[in-house]
Amino acid sequence: MRPDCTDFRQLFLDDVPMMDMRAPVEFAKGAFPGVVNLPLMNDQERQKVGTCYKQQGQAAAIALGHQLVSGTTKQARMDAWVAFTQANPQGYLYCFRGGLRSQIVQGWLRDEAGIQYPRVKGGYKAMRTFLLETTQQAVAQCDFVLLGGLTGTGKTDVLHQLDNVLDLEGHANHRGSSFGKRATAQPAQIDFENQLAIDVLKKRARGCEQFVLEDEGRIVGSCTVPLELYQGMQQYPLVWLEDSFANRVERILRDYVVNLSAEFIAVHGEEDGRRLFAERMLQSMANIYKRLGGERYQRLSEILRLALEEQQRSGAVDLHRGWIEGLLNEYYDPMYAYQRAAKAERIEFAGDAVEVREYLKARARRQPHH
């Protein structure tokens, strides 16, 4: 029989399949990529057992648990666990601390199905701690450089051409600006942190000791950059990406209008997709109402509304350039110019996409600064 697992590093490096015994409410707050939630108890059962534990102690709580998870309920769950073990013979099971819940399921599988299936010692809590430490160690030990630039210069396009990138926006499923929400939901905060840590772990295992990050705020949509990394980002050196105003307008039109509306249609179907896309765009503009001021907001949101109507009617997106140009000229560029001035002494290189990409590749080949 395979022993219970204590080597968390290998679990994540190899994407080892795992089944999570915790209740759905616990799982929803955060788990690990690719893990399957096959709970011992559902939310209501867990709540009842928890109340019983507080009032009558452990023995009574265990007895109630066995009573609640019995008969056809137990059989249905057993069938799901057995199917998982057969589909994933190299996998593991875990619960919150690697304690009672995983041991009960292990025992049932062994005694009633003849299956020896190992658990992760320390459970979710130990793996989560390991991943938090992974990110902290990288911040302490590795070399970081930030990629900055005005809105629409194509920072994400450049990042996707490098292999030593930590893609915060990718992990957060958000483009980082007021208009950055995607058609699909963002991950829970814990899932975001865990994905980021596993990315770090895998890249360091390949020998990567220098990372490129986009110059972000602390908040990427609803996800928050881990504090130790964000603190580092206040002092890491910067590489500044430059492009013409016209190119930037076209790129924003592509990413935030053409591609995003296609994303909404792919997720929600033609009719709902178009409607939800239009609602999202108007809401994104409304979200920066205070920062734009009343007059500017009225003018730009009216251009946006007319552009959305024209897009709905004919599929043409040309009118969108009006509000994009206005937002860049009157809102984003002045804000970024101020930020760039504040960070000027940290900028070690500036150039177009090709120059910046080559500079960052050459920089990664140099010895780390640490």
UniProtKB/Swiss-Prot annotation:
UniProt EC number: 2.9.1.3
Residues forming the catalytic site: 95
UniProt superkingdom: Bacteria
Membrane-crossing segments per the record: none
Catalytic activity from the UniProt record: 5-methylaminomethyl-2-thiouridine(34) in tRNA + selenophosphate + (2E)-geranyl diphosphate + H2O + H(+) = 5-methylaminomethyl-2-selenouridine(34) in tRNA + (2E)-thiogeraniol + phosphate + diphosphate; 5-methylaminomethyl-2-thiouridine(34) in tRNA + (2E)-geranyl diphosphate = 5-methylaminomethyl-S-(2E)-geranyl-thiouridine(34) in tRNA + diphosphate; 5-methylaminomethyl-S-(2E)-geranyl-thiouridine(34) in tRNA + selenophosphate + H(+) = 5-methylaminomethyl-2-(Se-phospho)selenouridine(34) in tRNA + (2E)-thiogeraniol; 5-methylaminomethyl-2-(Se-phospho)selenouridine(34) in tRNA + H2O = 5-methylaminomethyl-2-selenouridine(34) in tRNA + phosphate
The keyword NAD appears for this protein: no
Matching CDD domains: RHOD_YbbB
Ubl conjugation listed as a keyword: no
SUPFAM superfamilies tied to this protein: Rhodanese/Cell cycle control phosphatase (SSF52821)
InterPro entries: Rhodanese-like_dom, Rhodanese-like_dom_sf, SelU
Enzyme class name: transferase
GO MF entries: transferase activity, transferring alkyl or aryl (other than methyl) groups; tRNA 2-selenouridine synthase activity
UniProt KW keywords: Selenium, Transferase
Domain Rhodanese: 12-136
BP GO terms, sorted: tRNA wobble uridine modification
Annotated function: Involved in the post-transcriptional modification of the uridine at the wobble position (U34) of tRNA(Lys), tRNA(Glu) and tRNA(Gln). Catalyzes the conversion of 2-thiouridine (S2U-RNA) to 2-selenouridine (Se2U-RNA). Acts in a two-step process involving geranylation of 2-thiouridine (S2U) to S-geranyl-2-thiouridine (geS2U) and subsequent selenation of the latter derivative to 2-selenouridine (Se2U) in the tRNA chain.
Subunit structure of this chain's protein: Monomer.
Family under the similarity heading: Belongs to the SelU family.
Protein's name according to its UniProt entry: tRNA 2-selenouridine synthase
Taxonomic source organism: Pseudomonas putida (strain GB-1)
Gene expressing this chain: selU
